[in-house]
Amino acid sequence: MTAITRITLTGALLAAALLLAALQPARAETLDRIVAVVDDQVVLASELERELATIANQLRSRGQRLPPRDVFQRQVLERLITQRVQLSRAQRVGITVDDATLDAAMQRMARQNNMTLGQFRQAVEQEGFEYNYFREGIREEIAISRLRQAQVEEQVTVTPQEVEEVLETLDDENQEYRLGHILVATPEAASTAQLEEARERIEQLREQIIAGETDFEGAATAFSDAASAMEGGDLGWRLHSQLPSLFAEAIDEGLQAGEVSGVLQNSSGFHLVKLMDQRTQGGERVTETRARHILIRTDGDVITDEDARLRLRSLLERIEAGESFAELAEAYSEDPGSAARGGDLGWTQPGQLVPEFQGAMDALEEGQISAPFASPFGWHIVQVTDRRERDVSRERLRDQLAQQIHQRKVEEAFEQWIRRLRDEAYVDVRVEL
């Protein structure tokens, strides 16, 4: 068993240079006696001394004072016992790390430190460690990482509601809203008949907008009594605090981008507002593209590159002659994911597609179809069907919050899990602390 510095194998493997700087050889004169038994595993005195020296060096390098010897030794021994408890559980549930996986991990550690594997091995040995001993320590850490992932991380879920609750607690003053506005004004001392007539007018306008008989901007220009009528009702971008309270309430009640509010009333008359867009102040806007494609795969033998290109050229000519792109994609495209949707790839953001496809698509205007081109998947023709600018700041904030909530819940679950493992394990400490 090994007692090398703990290594976390989530994301990239740790920078081995830092690890090697902390590692120091065990004292040669340490007697190898058992200091603790954990299930069917043992912790040796030499391992405890090695871990004490390693952690002491780390603390000193950070300018921290060491705790009293008895406290320090108790903390480090408990750390080793916790490691053994996890290794014992990993063995019981059948978690193993084969040599191929271990070899790949060692190669990654070497690459991350700009070394060949031979140079990395030499660096480990120069620090006084036998390389195979170091290697087996990495094997143990991979096993522990897999155990934690299976029994803790994968059991933790984050619901959309949890994320939304956190979002609601955040200060929304950095949110900007672009509203469209229609006003049917009423006199200051309007009669009941005047109020009813105004309400009926705006309700009819709303019904026509919802039914698609007119668009909001056109209705605002033609019928709104507000100062923004000539701008199609566009109020421009405003912070939440800059919105009239009546409009802010509509936002707070859940009005979504593209939606038209119900009829709102105040002393000025009756209002409709449309949330045209929303963004985070100073946020990140991207151009999203909606496209559809037809893919012909090649195998180098039966279907060559030239065969695929000619087949796509023929399909392109049929589309230009008036046949439906969607129907031809459904019939001939060899991309099963999109063929059933007429080749539609949905909305994509820059960087989501392979560079060859992204470049061909970005060069097109809306409605334009590309010439046949190759990608790692085969040969394509692509048509851009729509483009839009969209603020993705809130989406990315939502993703970040989900990750943060997940990490917090994992940490809480891990503490409970490790305590349970410790309580369930047989532990016999054979040294006075």
Curated annotation (Swiss-Prot):
Catalyzed reactions: [protein]-peptidylproline (omega=180) = [protein]-peptidylproline (omega=0)
GO biological process: Gram-negative-bacterium-type cell outer membrane assembly; protein folding; protein stabilization
Compartments it resides in: Periplasm
PROSITE patterns hit by this protein: PPIC_PPIASE_1, PPIC_PPIASE_2
Domain of life from the UniProt record: Bacteria
Gene3D superfamilies named in the record: 3.10.50.40, Porin chaperone SurA, peptide-binding domain
This protein's UniProt keywords: Chaperone, Isomerase, Periplasm, Repeat, Rotamase, Signal
Entry protein name: Chaperone SurA
Organism the protein comes from: Alkalilimnicola ehrlichii (strain ATCC BAA-1101 / DSM 17681 / MLHE-1)
Gene behind the chain: surA
